[in-house]
């Protein structure tokens, strides 16, 4: 199949599923060759779906009921606060959240890095994860603990330090099989492709695939693209005005500790550029989870949760599990 990829031929869903399983027994050099060849060719929806299905089938299983995930592909190279972690804690005030995350590959603050910087412990086992969910409505599922089959592939990804299909796969491979998902992607064309792949992997009720002018989040300073899936596909664009918010700057973030501090500032009621960034994405997550009727409603729900102290209280609950 490597020659096929080098010739820029696309793989079918079945071939992609088989290739994933084959990579688990390949040398690091050949794994790197396959990943680079796929990335250079450009991954298709069938290839994403085949890899994602195989990754889920190889994962450690965990049943947490009907949950939501807030996750981004990463790989956008940005230096921003970890918005998806902030959003997941806000969302946990209203519904069950199983956040699937990892350490940083291409950014300054991956979700696992920031989660620990917030003073939270990553559950060691599925039993610990279930305990966290039962007590707090929230659990952080550290990708490396649920995908042991990938231990040969992770060092290759770390060494390559470039975007690969695995940047796309992480959010599609949550072992809790979320019914609702807001998923940030690192390029505009991935919105439709990843939405299609998510629908093909199965189990999803509603999802929003978002890309924000260079970010795998909705951007507070420009136009964002969304592909919405709820049994059918709909693609459209939004700006902060659609959320009742003013445009605001994105302030660079240099470390997980800085990201954690700035999230706590917002949770404590500080009104700044980070707040708009978080509110916009939280509103979209609340809409995806069918808690908010639309984006404007989502902003009001998120604001109330912050201003009433619910979000800080939720963070404290999660810290104390």
UniProtKB/Swiss-Prot annotation:
One of its GO terms (cellular component) is cytosol. 5-phospho-alpha-D-ribose 1-diphosphate binds at residues 72, 75-76, 80, 82-85, 99-107, 111. GO terms for biological process: L-tryptophan biosynthetic process. Binds 2 magnesium ions per monomer. Pathway: Amino-acid biosynthesis; L-tryptophan biosynthesis; L-tryptophan from chorismate: step 2/5. Its EC number is 2.4.2.18. GO terms for molecular function: anthranilate phosphoribosyltransferase activity; magnesium ion binding. Anthranilate 2 binds at residue 157. Anthranilate 1 binds at residues 72, 102. Keywords: Amino-acid biosynthesis, Aromatic amino acid biosynthesis, Glycosyltransferase, Magnesium, Metal-binding, Transferase, Tryptophan biosynthesis. It holds the Pfam family Glycos_trans_3N. It comes from the Archaea. Belongs to the anthranilate phosphoribosyltransferase family. NCBIfam families: trpD. Homodimer. Catalyzes the transfer of the phosphoribosyl group of 5-phosphorylribose-1-pyrophosphate (PRPP) to anthranilate to yield N-(5'-phosphoribosyl)-anthranilate (PRA). This is Anthranilate phosphoribosyltransferase. It comes from Methanococcus maripaludis (strain C5 / ATCC BAA-1333). The lineage of its organism: Archaea, Methanobacteriati, Methanobacteriota, Methanomada group, Methanococci. The gene is trpD.
